[in-house]
Amino acid sequence: RSGWRWCSEFFNHIGIVDTDTNVKYGAYIDISSKNLSNYNNSAITLYKNNITAGPFLWNGSIIPEDHVDMAICSFRSNENRWKSDKVTIPLMCEISHKDGYEEIDRIAKLTFILTNDRICRERISTLMSGKSKVSVLKEFDIIKDAMKDLSNVVDDLLESGSFSVPAIVPLPPKVKLGTNLETEIPGLYLAGESAGISGLLAASVMGIIAGENLIGK
């Protein structure tokens, strides 16, 4: 893993970075599915300004995803060992920073060091009371406020919910791509997360497009 780091450094080295200002970080919330029974297993995503809550992920578990010198939150529900009666809600804040890659790396590493664990799970009430391990980080003030907003639509969130950190969106800087996914360097194509698009389906489709263009050349 940590391909996003390698891509960030490589893109900068060969001079194809278009913008590097996007930073997404936050926390993974989990709460009993009983508190969201009226959502009917919906995988919705809620939006407010620069905050996203979702998609709502049902009946799985938050697990650590190792990235060389730190771990970040991930979600699994595809095996029996991950099954649960909980709903996981990725709560992410998107900000602009002049050095996006360095900033997201800094936030993730600071969180990882402060919690002293691969991923840290705490009660939301500890963050609300200022007693969380990440309460000293000003970057989590906006996450705290977002949890309060989310509690308006999720019953007993602040009282019975938990959150896990570090949580980031590990994507490299944006690169200019043509409609055929070719970069400014002839013959160099990007697909999937290296092109800033998450998901296996996206990676598969983009890989086919890039491959067909390479064969055509």
Please give the residue ranges for each predicted region.
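Residues forming the flavin
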Residues: R1-K217
